[in-house]
Design a protein with these regions (language model features):
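Beta-strand-rich ligand- or partner-binding modules
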Residues: 1-188
Length: 188
């Protein structure tokens, strides 16, 4: 047995539905830093403990940050809904020694293929936010958001506790903007 704390802790939130597309404001969080004076002693709150936090945010237009695929007749992949993917049979990869090109994989059309990040409807994870109150670095006008936090410590007897995390947001200023162009001689 040993004493001490893990050097890294990771938290990933569930998807957060904002109810409608919004503009994001600041990311606020409360991190407490602790240090244990030594073996068998209770940790105490210490602001100077070498504990860091990196909080990343991503935003999306739909309720899944993943895209699901099944195999086609010619071995390619086609995107399907999560429900269609879950109904498809799992991939059973069979290795054959006697194929035209010296062996390979037999894949059956309709089987589950890859699950990838949905880069069409979801942003990449933002650059890390290291201080509370920073402006959120994720695209606005999105309805869904997800947060992940990494709390790291350089010493075995220090750790951090994330007490709260909140996202400032506001309604969109306009859902759509329409402009008209007319010749100066023919105003409308």
């Amino acid at each position: 047995f040993g004493e001490g704390f893990l050097p890294e802790t990771r938290f990933v939130s569930h998807l957060i539905d904002m109810g409608e597309p919004v503009n994001f404001g600041r990311l606020l969080f409360d991190l407490e830093r602790y240090r244990s004076p030594g073996f068998g002693q209770n940790p105490v709150l210490e602001d100077g403990a070498t504990v860091n936090i990196d909080v990343e945010v991503r935003s999306g237009r739909d309720d899944t940050p993943l895209s699901h695929h099944i195999y086609t007749d010619i071995g390619g992949e086609i995107e399907v809904t999560e429900q269609q993917y879950n109904r498809a049979p799992p991939t059973m990869v069979l290795f054959t020694e006697f194929r035209q090109f010296g062996g390979g994989l037999n894949i059956i059309a309709g089987q589950q293929a890859s699950i990838k990040d949905d880069l069409t409807n979801w942003s990449f994870w933002s650059a890390p936010h290291t201080s509370s109150g920073e402006a959120i670095q994720a695209p606005d006008a999105r309805q869904f958001v997800q947060v992940r936090a990494f709390i790291t410590s350089e010493e075995v007897f220090t750790f951090g506790r994330l007490n709260s995390l909140s996202i400032e947001f506001s309604p969109l200023l306009a859902n759509s903007v329409v402009g008209e162009v007319a010749r100066m001689e023919e105003p409308q």
